[in-house]
């Protein structure tokens, strides 16, 4: 047949086609890149803003049977519960407007590739005023508490002691000495570093190491530092401070240390200028500044300090007028709830009054009533502290308590002036002052819903801040569930303790217990010193604070 000449052996055809007669379809598992799309989808996502208190049901659909995970980024305000069959209940409740971000992920299988979906739900806050008031009815199991009337040694508040360092030859503080300060009621120590030996030169490496050694001791001993630098204590000294350029060089030298010890520095007093670093008797910064040009050297120093100190920390100026004049501020420019703690220059400049109650104007601390009004408003959001300096009719107990409240005092020196302190003790207000400097959180009650493993539980905490001020540095708030199996589950409370001002406060949050039985704690920890119980806040209630863990027991489910 003519067609035979076109026939080719089968093996040759296979070879020409690049195949082998023994080839068979591959049964190997394809790579993730080759896997099919599982068509992961989420139903029930609202297209519009939802009101706080809304309960949503989310249903996840997918062709794959890979493991599913659903999570929210704000568990304090969005409780998530698995209902089974790929259904989830989401309950949202927030005092302010928020976006709740939800992520859904599914593992890859032999047939389908991994999948993920992310979406956001806008939640309208109920408003701070809509949080339960002190006498409002609250649902759930109620737990009440008894106030601990003793003064409590809490971090970053209270009475302070002082320690001076005059040269690099001095032995730094020992940890034992620091711990002994705590036992006498001091969680704050004013470290006064005198730079007399360096008034015309750079700081020595040895002196800088001495500074660091003192701060190391404070950290290990559980105390924080109020830091001040100065050049002399002598009002008759020929040179009361260094040249402006020298001071700025010293600040630059100190910057690495200030950055390194952010965790243990409570606040930095502006210092450097004048006798004791109090910005008054000065040789090089203008004794009585009036014009913007007069204030220029002090502003140069303040700007340098703002740059040298971590943004989380504040700098105290000796009078409100310094802040107003250097930064062209009027009474209307005081810090508000919106601008507080936003990292701006204005939000980071605080004050210290080292002649508290000495006379009508506290020995020049206040130029006029505007200056007083400025500090009254500003200190709601910035650190205020200092010491007394002379007995007068302005430091009688009733006026003293009013001023401490009005100016939101956080700390006070209990070593000076002894006449004033003795008067407060004999007149019966010293103990009250010791108790209420800074914050003092007293639980009123807690209400919680039924506790079931794996199910979000709503908890309402009502408390009073009986202190003169709110906490001022960043602080975390955690709900800590310790299950009956001993395991710990932590969830952020969702509130900033710096907003817990004097008076009544309340919070509403969620936690998801891992077991049906266990204990719920509130931990108010220092974010830069995690796990340090001595730097955690103790609530002023009996039988609540655990000194070993730094936790405050809210309730136990047995």
Place the predicted regions along the sequence by residue.
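An active-site-proximal structural segment forming one wall of the substrate-binding cleft
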Residues: 207-220, 241-267, 294-308
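Short, solvent-exposed loop/linker segments at beta-strand-coil boundaries, enriched for Pro/Gly
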Residues: 64-68, 72-80
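Boundary/entry segment of secreted carbohydrate-active catalytic domains
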Residues: 129-187, 192
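Catalytic-core regions of glycoside hydrolase
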Residues: 267-269, 278, 282-417
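Extracellular/luminal regions of secreted and cell-surface proteins that mediate adhesion/ECM remodeling
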Residues: 435-558
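Active-site groove signature of glycoside hydrolases
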Residues: 226-236, 254-291
